């Protein structure tokens, strides 16, 4: 598969998201164990998607309604950590918040690549 293939581009961006979440998790205070566990769970889900995308398969990945709901609920649990979050502001509150902002923008890029590609 050529490097210009949308699937290869998507794999690279998801790898960026996983890495940035890992960096954010590394800078998250040990007292925030629930947040650290949630970040690890999200990394694990993204790694499962990566394993699928790395396969040379015509089979399509489907995230069931339960998986989507679980991910949305996980995102909702982050809201107390980002009280007053403004996506148009410069992320400077702390390292963890800045790294999560990088992960968020990379995830949005992955979403756009997926929407453009014939992967659905």
Label each region the model flagged.
Residues 1-120:
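Phosphate/pyrophosphate-binding loop motifs in nucleotide- or prenyl diphosphate-using proteins
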